[in-house]
């Protein structure tokens, strides 16, 4: 499991890194808000420990930008006892928890276990790329602002794209997975359902799109 610690006091950051590494976590460090935001937006982290008082950009500003980008990475604020107002603000902006410095190692580890466990349960029924989630229980495509229901064929097709994101998938493979073994008559249907999905992605203002590779197949890509 990969964690990020965003803390400007290097000695504290390195102590947390050593504690977590000893428990088997992979831990990266950032020492200011700008770097922390850049790291978080990669989407590589299972959880972030984020200090509120940071150089260049505050922890509250980092959190706001992360949630605006549609990322739901669990974030635990590291706060001082005097920062009650910031704690409330942070929770209102979408922080998952906070822990007051100085803190006990066991308390920090317990909070990390709780938040990553809850996040894993949420992710179990979701596939995600960019700012779009596919809910495999409700068969809905979701963005931060809205959601759309998919038909059975649309869902099966989108699930293949999400599970094979950024890979070109041959047309015959898509047809086999969605319609089963069939003849060439299904190719027109495939194009129709691709068109339906593209319209729904545009409605959601998605930053991902279905790309056609002429004569071969399709891929689901993030917009550049």
Curated annotation (Swiss-Prot):
CDD domains in alphabetical order = REC_OmpR_DrrD-like, trans_reg_C
Mind telling me which Pfam families this protein's record contains? Response_reg (PF00072), Trans_reg_C (PF00486)
**MF-aspect GO terms:** phosphorelay response regulator activity; transcription cis-regulatory region binding
Which PROSITE patterns did the record assign? OMPR_PHOB (PS51755), RESPONSE_REGULATORY (PS50110)
Any one GO BP annotation for this protein: regulation of DNA-templated transcription
Localization recorded for this chain is:
Cytoplasm
Q: Which UniProt keywords apply?
A: Cytoplasm, DNA-binding, Phosphoprotein, Transcription, Transcription regulation, Two-component regulatory system
User: PTM per UniProt?
Assistant: Phosphorylated by DltS.
The residue ranges of the Response regulatory domain are 2-116
UniProt keyword Transcription present: yes
User: Residues bearing 4-aspartylphosphate?
Assistant: 51
The record, for SUPFAM superfamilies, names: CheY-like (SSF52172)
Q: InterPro entries attached here? A: CheY-like_superfamily (IPR011006), OmpR/PhoB-type_DNA-bd (IPR001867), Sig_transdc_resp-reg_receiver (IPR001789), WalR-like (IPR039420), WH-like_DNA-bd_sf (IPR036388)
Question: What's one GO-annotated cellular component?
Answer: cytosol
Locate the DNA-binding region by residue range: 124-222
Q: What is its main location?
A: cytoplasm
Q: What does this protein do?
A: Member of the two-component regulatory system DltS/DltR. Regulates the expression of the dlt operon.
Instruction: Kindly provide the name given to this protein in its UniProt entry.
Output: Transcriptional regulatory protein DltR
Q: Which organism is it from?
A: Streptococcus agalactiae serotype V (strain ATCC BAA-611 / 2603 V/R)
């Amino acid at each position: 499991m990969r964690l990020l610690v965003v803390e400007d006091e290097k000695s504290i950051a390195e102590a947390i890194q050593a504690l977590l590494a000893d428990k088997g976590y992979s831990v990266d460090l950032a020492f200011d808000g700008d770097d922390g935001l850049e790291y978080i937006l990669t989407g590589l982290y299972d959880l972030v420990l984020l200090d509120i008082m940071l150089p260049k950009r505050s922890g509250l500003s980092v959190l706001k930008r992360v949630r605006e980008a549609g990322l739901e990475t669990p974030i635990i604020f590291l706060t001082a006892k005097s920062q009650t107002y910031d704690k409330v603000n942070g929770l209102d902006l979408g922080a998952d928890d906070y822990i007051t410095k100085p803190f006990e190692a066991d308390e920090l580890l317990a909070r990390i276990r709780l938040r990553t466990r809850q996040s894993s349960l949420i992710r179990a029924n979701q596939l995600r790329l960019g700012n779009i989630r596919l809910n495999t229980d409700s068969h809905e495509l979701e963005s931060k602002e809205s959601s759309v229901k998919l038909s059975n064929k649309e869902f099966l097709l989108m699930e293949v794209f999400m599970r094979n994101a950024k890979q070109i998938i041959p047309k015959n493979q898509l047809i086999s997975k969605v319609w089963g073994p069939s003849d060439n008559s299904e190719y027109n249907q495939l194009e129709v359902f691709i068109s339906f999905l593209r319209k729904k992605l545009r409605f959601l203002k998605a930053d991902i799109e279905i790309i056609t590779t002429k004569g071969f197949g399709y891929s689901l890509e993030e917009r550049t």
